[in-house]
């Protein structure tokens, strides 16, 4: 609880004690009125101050003005009727302040989730000078400098580890508690916490361009992007509040005047009381407070789960998503080539991989890297000679005195070697040794473990169609789509073709259905911007993704996509629940108040009670664990 909240709680407690004394302890009438007045000022002085300030600034009609007029009017009416019991007037402000405390707590809880994310901001960077560590401002560290990160410290700037090993806690960024093991040569991003081991990191970016700075900028700007619901409520309150003030004035004046004209008693006190009750009931704070709070809580809850939503307008659009389009590589697949199959003739698997890795040792192609990774041992280049690349076919080399040919079926055909066809999906590398077929190795982009479950989860959330876009061949793309359960696939696409394909899908869909595009942030910026909602996945370290996307998933777990949609739908559902509940209760109580059936206590419930219930409902948007 903040200092301000504690002060308010103390004021509420003092006001309750004073109110009970004034209500139930016998005392002279004048003393009772004075005690009620003191209680009123203890609990409501800030409301009176805000109302006066609003009038001075030309913003007359707000909830503070309504509360001030209604309660001061109730006090004046009681004094006029020589009634020393001012409980109703004081209770209106007391319960209003209790409602405000609830709201403040809810906002604080949401803000703490976002603040936990904001806590990734590093205060300093360590630079080693003459064998001693010197703490400097991260802004002053140049690209290419070597910084030192000790256990318990935050990584201040993106870079590459040049010395040391450690476990990094990335939970503030990804929402995942599992530590990430780091070794020399690996990239690290700012905002992670070093849990063990000293790291020396060569920076690859300035602090202002680092991941942590980009994310903090994104979070700070999220509250400025309003949804249609928030914009409507703001406009509604600007028209609604003056309208109810005029209605209350009419209710206080017109019926007594009509009574006088008709020759009946005016009953001014009765109609003024009804008008004051009408004012309290009509206060729009339940809507004005709970709607932005629901979105704020939703964004806070999402950030805790490693999902950054750039504003409530994007949350509203995300909740209406019916079509999800994936750029295959990096979202549904790992985007890393791996050896997925070895089919040999006479040689053992290990020997075939060893010869293939050595033959490909001079190539920088990803296929060569995947072979070396599968081999898992250092390459002895002294064993390799006479390397010759054959464009579009493969290469030949001599390894340990043996003539190795490795490539596609066209290479085997060119060399007159009969190869065995392979029906596996992926890149097939046929291998011949001294002119004799030795077998083949299958290299493919591996599907993510949760990719199939992620597609199924999207369909359970109500997504009507999933689409996969890829530059792969039709055969490979079709097999991946079939394995994962994707509804529609478009293959052999260039980056520009993906934009065209998304535009076609946008033209075909219904206006109410929204299309989300999911990419890994690499060359995806045009498509992320073109879709109704752009989702960048695994965006840690990708500036382009953070800039172009509307929703940023901080790790590469495809299950987070359905979670993001689920969070947004829960948030929007809560918003509509609060709107309907507040309007229905207020409308019913306004009618009862105008008819003289509702008293000030019912008015308190219609205002403060509804606001507290709406705020408590809004807090539910923070709970995202089981969404």
What does each model-found stretch correspond to?
Residues 65-66, 91-151, 172, 182, ...:
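Juxtamembrane coupling segments of multi-pass membrane pumps/enzymes
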């Amino acid at each position: 609880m903040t200092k301000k909240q504690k002060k308010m709680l103390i004021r509420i407690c003092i006001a309750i004690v004073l109110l009970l004394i004034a209500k139930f302890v016998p005392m002279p009438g004048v003393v009772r009125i004075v005690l009620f007045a003191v209680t009123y000022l203890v609990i409501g002085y800030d409301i009176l101050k805000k109302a006066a300030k609003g009038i001075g600034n030309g913003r007359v009609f707000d909830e503070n003005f309504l509360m001030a007029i209604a309660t001061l009017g109730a006090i004046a009416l009681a004094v006029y009727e020589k009634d020393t019991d001012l409980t109703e007037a004081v209770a209106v402000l007391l319960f209003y302040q209790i409602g405000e405390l609830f709201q403040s707590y809810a906002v604080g809880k949401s803000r703490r989730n976002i603040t936990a994310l904001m806590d990734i901001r590093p205060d300093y960077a360590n630079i080693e000078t003459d064998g001693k560590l010197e703490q400097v401002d991260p802004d002053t560290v140049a690209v290419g400098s070597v910084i030192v990160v000790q256990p318990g410290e935050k990584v201040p700037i993106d870079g590459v580890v040049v010395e040391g090993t450690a476990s990094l806690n990335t939970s503030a960024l990804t929402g995942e508690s599992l530590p990430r093991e780091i070794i020399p040569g690996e990239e690290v991003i700012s905002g992670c916490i070093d849990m063990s081991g000293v790291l020396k990191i060569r920076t690859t970016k300035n602090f202002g361009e680092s991941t942590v700075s980009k994310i903090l900028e994104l979070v700070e700007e999220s509250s400025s992007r309003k949804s249609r619901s928030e914009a409507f409520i703001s406009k509604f309150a600007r028209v609604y509040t003056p309208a109810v003030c005029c209605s209350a004035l009419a209710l206080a004046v017109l019926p007594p005047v009509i009574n006088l004209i008709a020759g009946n008693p005016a009953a001014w006190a009765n109609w003024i009381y009804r008008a004051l009750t009408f004012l309290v009931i009509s206060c729009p704070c339940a809507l004005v407070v709970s709607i932005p709070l629901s979105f704020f809580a939703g964004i806070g809850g999402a950030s805790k789960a490693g999902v950054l939503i750039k504003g409530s307008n994007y949350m509203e659009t995300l909740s209406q998503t019916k079509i999800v389009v994936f750029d295959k590589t990096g979202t549904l697949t790992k985007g890393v080539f791996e050896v997925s199959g070895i089919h040999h003739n006479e040689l053992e698997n290990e020997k075939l991989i060893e010869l293939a890795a050595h033959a490909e040792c001079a190539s920088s192609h990803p296929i060569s890297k995947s072979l070396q990774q599968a081999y898992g041992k250092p390459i002895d280049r002294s064993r390799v000679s006479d390397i010759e690349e054959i464009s579009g076919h493969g290469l030949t080399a001599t390894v340990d005195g043996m003539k190795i040919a490795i490539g596609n079926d066209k290479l085997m055909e060119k060399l007159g070697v009969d190869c065995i066809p392979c029906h596996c999906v992926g890149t097939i590398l046929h291998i011949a040794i001294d002119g004799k077929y030795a077998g083949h190795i299958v290299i493919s982009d591996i599907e993510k473990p949760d990719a199939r479950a992620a597609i199924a989860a999207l369909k359970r959330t109500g997504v009507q169609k999933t689409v996969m876009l890829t530059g792969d061949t039709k055969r490979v793309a079709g097999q991946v789509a079939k394995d994962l359960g994707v509804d529609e696939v478009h293959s052999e696409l260039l980056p520009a073709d993906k934009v065209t394909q998304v535009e076609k899908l946008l033209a075909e869909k219904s206006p109410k259905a929204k299309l989300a595009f999911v990419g890994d942030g690499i060359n995806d910026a045009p498509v992320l911007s073109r879709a109704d909602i752009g989702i960048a996945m695994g965006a840690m370290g990708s500036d382009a993704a953070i800039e172009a996307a509307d929703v940023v998933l901080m790790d590469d777990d495809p299950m987070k996509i359905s979670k993001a949609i689920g969070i947004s739908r829960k948030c929007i559902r809560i918003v509509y629940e609060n709107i309907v509940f507040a309007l229905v209760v207020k409308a019913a109580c306004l009618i009862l108040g105008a008819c003289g059936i509702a008293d000030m206590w019912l008015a308190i419930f219609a205002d403060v009670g509804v606001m507290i219930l709406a705020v408590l409902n809004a807090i539910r948007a923070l709970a995202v664990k089981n969404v």
